[in-house]
Amino acid sequence: MKKNVQIKGTKSGISIFLSDKASISELQQELSQLLADQKQNPYSGEKLEVQVQIGNRLFSEEEEREISTIIHNNSQMKISAFYSNVMSKDEAKKWKENDQIFSMATIIRSGQVVQVPGDFLLIGDVNPGGQIRSNGNVFVLGNIKGIIHAGFEGDENAVVAGKFLYPSQVRIAGKVYGFDSEDYKEVADTDLFSAFVNDAGEIVIDEIHKIRKIRPEISNFQGGR
């Protein structure tokens, strides 16, 4: 008969596996019994961090608290995290939004801030004082004179593509690159360029075709909004 609760050592440390076929009350009972049996071999060191693997199910906050309490009160272990093979509706919604390409055909004027959860394609210009914030990549088919912030929530793998003109600024995650020096002031036109964070953690401006080599997954993007 397969046990509903098992404690195993893994590459990432100690894990407690809770069967997704058992009810929460069955898991609580078996977990309490298993930990009680292990008290026969007491451990006197610091509390050990464990991961709790719950399989193809989700626990409510109350259920997580109940399991945590049992482990805390009956062992020298403390939970670092609960891990599930499935995601909540909110997580699924956010994942889908971040996987989409949002597109607009307009001019982003001074004072305007456009923010999207996924990748963003703009057909038009970004004027000085205008700003785009995207959790993913940003592609602008037009002149950039405002602020472009890709990887807004911290993704340093994001890229920006467009015509970078004075006094634009590119931000990728927490990195910043400015086109506000005198060298850029007299540039009236330019080709499309790409901006990305290199292995040294710095934003690099390079030819547009380099994107495919630096971020090959971008060539597989599909979709729209």
UniProtKB/Swiss-Prot annotation:
Any GO BP: cell morphogenesis
Keyword tags: Cell cycle, Cell division, Septation
Entries under SUPFAM superfamilies matching the protein: Cell-division inhibitor MinC, C-terminal domain
Keyword Transferase: no
InterPro entries for this protein: CAP/MinC_C, MinC, MinC_C_sf, MinC_N_1, Septum_form_inhib_MinC_C
Keyword S-adenosyl-L-methionine: no
Family that this chain belongs to: Belongs to the MinC family.
PANTHER family xref list: SEPTUM SITE-DETERMINING PROTEIN MINC
Assembly and interaction partners: Interacts with MinD and FtsZ.
Protein name: Probable septum site-determining protein MinC
Natural source organism: Listeria innocua serovar 6a (strain ATCC BAA-680 / CLIP 11262)
